[in-house]
C-alpha cells in the first residue's frame, strides 16, 4: 500500500531502481536520452546558479513593477531590458520563431501567451509570467503568478 501524507506519496526505498528500470525501458524503445552526467564541474554548477539568480531577480523586479493598465508588451520590454542589463539573454526570444522575450498568460490562457501591445492587465486578472534566462550558456527557467488589483476568491484559489 502506498503511503500518503497530505496528498504526497513517499518515494519507495527502491526509487533509484524504478527510475533506472524506466530509463532502460525508454532506451529499448529507441528514445534518445541525455547523459545522466550532464554536470561535471563546480564551474558548471556555478553557471547554472548565476543564471537562476538572475532569473529569480527578474521575477522579483516584475513583482515590484507589474500593475493594472500595463500591456503585456510592457512586461516583455521589462524582461528584455533587465535580462540584457545583466549580461544574459532571454531564452524564448526568437527560439523556434517565438517573437518575444517572455511568456505572459492571463487568466484562462494555460501557458505560453505571447505579449501584445493590445492586451492590458485589468483588476481581477491573474497573470503568469514565465521567464527563461541564458547566462554564459547556462539556462534557468521559472514562472510566477501575480494578482492584479482585487482578485475574486475563486481566482485566488487557482
Briefly describe each language-model feature range.
Residues 1-158:
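Active-site neighborhoods and metal-handling regions in enzymes and metal-associated proteins
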Amino acid at each position: 500500500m502506498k503511503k500518503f501524507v497530505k496528498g504526497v506519496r513517499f518515494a519507495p526505498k527502491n526509487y533509484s531502481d524504478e527510475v533506472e528500470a524506466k530509463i532502460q525501458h525508454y532506451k529499448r524503445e529507441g528514445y534518445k536520452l541525455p547523459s545522466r552526467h550532464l554536470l561535471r564541474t563546480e564551474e558548471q554548477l556555478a553557471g547554472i546558479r548565476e543564471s537562476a539568480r538572475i532569473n529569480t531577480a527578474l521575477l522579483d523586479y516584475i513583482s515590484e513593477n507589474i500593475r493594472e493598465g500595463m500591456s503585456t508588451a510592457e512586461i516583455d520590454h521589462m524582461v528584455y531590458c533587465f535580462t540584457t542589463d545583466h549580461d544574459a539573454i532571454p531564452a524564448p526570444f526568437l527560439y523556434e520563431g517565438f517573437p518575444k522575450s517572455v511568456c505572459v498568460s492571463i487568466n484562462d490562457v494555460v501557458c505560453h501567451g505571447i505579449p501584445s501591445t493590445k492586451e492590458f492587465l485589468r483588476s481581477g486578472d491573474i497573470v503568469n509570467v514565465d521567464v527563461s534566462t541564458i547566462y554564459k550558456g547556462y539556462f534557468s527557467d521559472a514562472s510566477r503568478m501575480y494578482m492584479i488589483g482585487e482578485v475574486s476568491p475563486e481566482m485566488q484559489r487557482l
